[in-house]
């Protein structure tokens, strides 16, 4: 009996020992798993397909191209940008360097905002010290932007000078050998990054031209107003005066914009010195990118489709098909839209839930046609309809009609789109700007800022005729009453505005 009790006790002790051993093993497994996860976070490369990243041959790798070579030759800031671009390309990222400084600034703001949100989520969910550090080693004022979890952020700020010094040394090791510059003129750069003259803003041109004159003339000051100091390449139609202000005649201002005149000054100077090659940076790459974007969009969107463009919070632009609400395409940036297009832009505002603007575009023949900077036949047709309506109201007797032919298919489509945009049949077409001024002149009203309102019902005939596939569209309309006002009047909660864009 006692032996049986001892055996049972030993058996229970063995079971408990096995249980303890199993618990210890589980603890070891959990500890190892947690440690391996942290190690993986610390040792893993930035992308799954990468091996341990080696920056010893950044600009000589297959990721380097003409863009990075051009940037690297522009100095320390360009070298830093080239290394960053080459790093992203080596990691198989489908992005390209934005050569337009204005668009690049907008992308920087958008992406920094996204980085802040991602970093806040990471530090909160994971509970690790993490920061974002952005550096551009320009002198004498380098860019050093750091944000993230404290106290790591403060620690990094403390070592700012050391980090900048080490970064400059590392970039200097990879910088290409300086080339002999056989030119008296400086390269066109904005914040150390090369830029094309056609992408420089007016403010940038006004600041650059005096510096350019120092190199071209060899004088410390331009000598504004002194004919003896005027360079031979200076345009004849631009006064030899300080470029900070436009002192041309009103006729000259109407003919050529001040920004375009400033660009002409820069182009003349560089052509005189035989350095046109410095005027256009990344030009070949941008032309190829635009052609690719135009080709891809034309294949994404079916022909004869009416779409709306929507700007998303993340900076992308979506093309939404009218009627179905389906997303036809999403573009990374509005700059990807083709620029060789001309169509009238039609806006309508819904004031019930707050003012909402939607840009309309028409796709014809498989090619995207979005309103940019030119007044097309469509806008002229709408303006002509407005003039006809005014003439009918003033010169014709009650009950008479006015007939007008629209021989342009583009104009007919624009009028049809205009009618579709009006949600209420009793709404009003509101004409503004140049069109309102022209109609105002016909009615004897000299106020160019007034608005002319025309009933939408006059366009129903156009819609019916288009649906039946008839030839030239004739619009018959009864006399209407024109009203000029200082503010837009909303009819039945809707208003339609025809915006005429001029270059």
UniProtKB/Swiss-Prot annotation:
A GO molecular-function annotation: DNA-binding transcription activator activity, RNA polymerase II-specific
Subcellular location: Nucleus
Region listing for Dimerization, in residue ranges: 1-78
Expressed in which tissues: Ubiquitously expressed with strongest expression in skeletal muscle.
Region (Disordered): 36-57
GO biological process, one term: positive regulation of transcription by RNA polymerase II
InterPro entries for this protein: NRF1/Ewg, Nrf1_NLS/DNA-bd_dimer
Keyword vocabulary terms for this entry: Activator, DNA-binding, Isopeptide bond, Nucleus, Phosphoprotein, Transcription, Transcription regulation, Ubl conjugation
Sequence motif Nuclear localization signal, residues: 88-116
Chain segments carrying region Required for transcriptional activation: 301-476
Residue numbers bearing the Phosphoserine modification: 39, 44, 46-47, 52
Source organism, top-level taxon: Eukaryota
DNA-binding residue intervals: 109-305
Gene Ontology CC: cytosol; extracellular exosome; nucleoplasm; nucleus
Post-translational changes noted in the entry: Phosphorylation enhances DNA binding.
Cross-link named Glycyl lysine isopeptide (Lys-Gly) (interchain with G-Cter in SUMO2), sites: 139
Subunit structure: Homodimer. Binds DNA as a dimer. Interacts with PPRC1.
PANTHER family tied to this protein: NUCLEAR RESPIRATORY FACTOR 1
Family listed: Belongs to the NRF1/Ewg family.
Function: Transcription factor that activates the expression of the EIF2S1 (EIF2-alpha) gene. Links the transcriptional modulation of key metabolic genes to cellular growth and development. Implicated in the control of nuclear genes required for respiration, heme biosynthesis, and mitochondrial DNA transcription and replication.
Protein name listed in UniProt: Nuclear respiratory factor 1
Organism listed in the record: Homo sapiens
